[in-house]
Amino acid sequence: MGNGANHFTKDSSPIPPHISPPYSPSTTTTTTTTTTTTSPTNTNTITIINIRAFDP
């Protein structure tokens, strides 16, 4: 029982809460705007990160 709970917290802690809340509402929005003005190629990279953060 202890192993199962530990595995879930380890696999669900550093991915969703670290990329979903802090990276989606603030960092992602700011980065997308800045990147779009800087280079169109970079926008593709940011879009992939955006979808990844919203998926999990």
From Swiss-Prot:
Natural source organism: Dictyostelium discoideum (Social amoeba)
Compositionally biased spans, kind Low complexity: 25-56
Biased composition (Pro residues): 14-24
Protein name: Putative uncharacterized protein DDB_G0277609
Annotated spans, Disordered: 1-56
